[in-house]
Amino acid sequence: MDIAVQIALFHKFPCAPHSMKQHFPAHQLTGAAKQRFQQGIYRVARGGSLAELIVDGASTVLANTSNTPWGMLRCPDGSFLVVVLENQPSVDGQNSESQPRVYRYYWDADAAAAPAGSSLTVWSLENNDTVRSAITLYEAAHPGCTVNYEIALQDSAETREDAISSLNAALLAGSGPDVIILDDLDWEAYAEKGLLADLTAYVDTDALQANLAAPFLNGDGSACVLPARFSIPVICGSPEDLAAAQTLDDLAQLLLSLPARPAWDASDSGYYQPLDEPYGMGFVSVEQLLDFALEASAPALVESGVNSSAVGDVLRFVQQVGSYYGMDRYQGLISNGVVSSSDASESVAYGDGSYECFSTRNARMAWDEMLSPAYVQAVHTEEGSFSVALRPGLIEGAFLPRTLVGISVSSTRPEEAGAFVSILFGDEVQSTWQQDGMPVQAASLQNSIHRNCTDDSALSNVQALIDALKTPVTRIDSTVYDTLLENANALIAGETTLEQAQTGVENALALYLAEQN
């Protein structure tokens, strides 16, 4: 633990010197371990293996992902001291400033227990950073009010399908959560079935980025679902390569004109050695290649019913590139990436598609999911003349809405639910960077762009990307996706024809659409 932190703790809490063997440097946590710390404080009995949650992070400063956990220690009286660096936007909104704070969490036997059913319930399939940030602010603004954050797939043997079925049954029975995070759900089906309330009494839609909000607004201006965050599926390359990759078919032909990617991953020594001539793009699995296409094409598959042409276009792209790359030999390849950050900007994540272009430099072009304007700034500083463009696909202006919010019409606490949603779309949440995407509030988005893009070229590149966004793309039905992936693998292995694969996918889509009606 830093000596400055030790001195501060000794001065504030005399018990701290006797606890130094029970501390750990939280700032060294990364990935899943850091996310677990944000979820709360756990303990494991000596010799045991099950982790017991003793401090729920949802009700503490730990949940605010804009903060950096720095250290924690357990005191002899059983309480916990936690040091965090709290990030606060500067007066001009262009930078953030970190202030260290010490928090103490302890058991209060005399504290009044919350009455059963007195909490506002927020539900999501997966953990959501923006939601946790809003929970912290909501409880601070409403003393005595608590939020029960139900994460369906956390520490549960329940499958995704079972979790969704349980949610649907509860909503149809007039019970269930007050606020629903609809990420990875068919949000349009929930809205069309009248299960969600209008949000416009709690969210100023005029303050949102207009082209991002427009797809979610009804003709009368109402909105049952709104995204609090978004990301963009992108590709990167030279101006000449980007001009030659305007469609999926164009991109396939470009990739086929370049060397094929070897069937290697980060565990192979050759992976890090420069090739004489780079291959087109880096993919480590058929699933990754399919996702690449679907993230800019999925809505087209069910446009005016089952769209045979669109199904064929996606399968043909995957077959051409996957067969050329020999992806039937891509068995268990390890995914790779890197995350970098600085005090002046938001973190930048390079997944496989970017890593193999900018780090190993064996791919000629990059692809990724852009979660921050800082990604574009990073790309513009790479060696070579790289720009960022929307990923080619079958729809215009694809973006990925995140933290899709809805309020249940059967909520017994509609005003409290509305107040929570207001915080999600308010300045305090929207102005802070979260790891799950960019803010939809127009002013906060512009502040983020100008804070992260120091070059005029990067600034104009980001603005052009944002202005071109038009169509939200959400996760395709899991049964349909499984059918797509199964047929994609069979196509690449030469075990089926394109016509047969297309028929199989179309049948799955037809069944899905019939079940929705």
Where are these regions (language model features)?
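Repeated scaffold domains used in trafficking and secretory/extracellular systems
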Residues: 17, 26, 31-34, 66-75
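Short, well-ordered beta-strand elements
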Residues: 115-127, 145-152, 179, 224
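Extracytoplasmic "Venus flytrap"/periplasmic binding protein-like
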Residues: 148-210, 355-358, 364-365
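Hinge/lid segment of periplasmic solute-binding proteins
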Residues: 184-234, 249-250, 385-390
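Helix-loop-helix "hinge/cap" segment bordering the ligand-binding cleft or interdomain interface
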Residues: 218-336, 409-415, 497-500
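Periplasmic-binding protein-like
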Residues: 260-261, 421-446
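Extracytoplasmic/periplasmic substrate-binding proteins
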Residues: 319-413
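Long, aromatic- and glycine/proline-rich binding clefts that accommodate carbohydrate-like moieties
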Residues: 434-486, 490
